[in-house]
């Protein structure tokens, strides 16, 4: 059984989802993976609805798990950039597969479900 810190997991899939799961982490990973290094404000603008505090927390957790790298530059005003680590980049094929699965699911299931509701079924 895998363990992360003090937490035990039933399997590696559960551990993976605990690291990248949540409303905002995958979106942040997606932008960093597809668009490259971003400053905090750029990431926040790409994620409408996220609060500054939530983005800070999500990025810190990803940094703690060595998925995201945070680079602080000694300039005024402060400049901080975020990028994927090598370990973080290994998640991109998984995120790509999840994206494709979601597109297919929406196209086949949700569209059919909406049509059935319109037809009274």
Model-derived segments and their meaning:
Residues 69-70:
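Short beta-strand "wing" residues that participate in macromolecule-binding interfaces
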Residues 58:
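Residues within the DNA-recognition helix of helix-turn-helix
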Residues 7-54, 81:
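N-terminal helix-turn-helix DNA-binding core of bacterial DNA-binding proteins
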Residues 62:
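DNA major-groove recognition helices of helix-turn-helix
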Residues 31, 89-121:
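Amphipathic alpha-helical dimerization/coiled-coil segments
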Residues 1-4:
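Long, low-complexity, charged/polar intrinsically disordered regions in eukaryotic proteins
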Residues 74-98:
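Basic, amphipathic "hinge/linker" alpha-helix immediately C-terminal to the N-terminal HTH DNA-binding motif
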Residues 66:
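Glycine-centered, phosphate/nucleic-acid-interacting loop/turn motifs that mediate DNA/RNA or nucleotide
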């Amino acid at each position: 059984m895998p363990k992360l810190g003090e937490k035990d997991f039933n399997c590696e899939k559960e551990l993976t989802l605990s690291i990248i799961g949540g409303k905002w982490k995958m979106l942040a990973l997606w932008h960093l993976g597809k668009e490259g290094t971003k400053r905090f404000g750029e990431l926040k603008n790409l994620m409408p609805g996220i609060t500054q505090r939530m983005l800070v927390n999500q990025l810190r957790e990803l940094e703690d798990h060595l998925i995201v790298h945070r680079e602080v530059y000694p300039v005024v005003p402060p400049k901080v950039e975020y990028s994927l680590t090598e370990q973080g980049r290994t998640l991109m094929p998984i995120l790509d597969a999840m994206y494709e699965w979601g597109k297919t699911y929406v196209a086949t299931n949700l569209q059919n479900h909406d049509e059935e509701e319109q037809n009274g079924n």
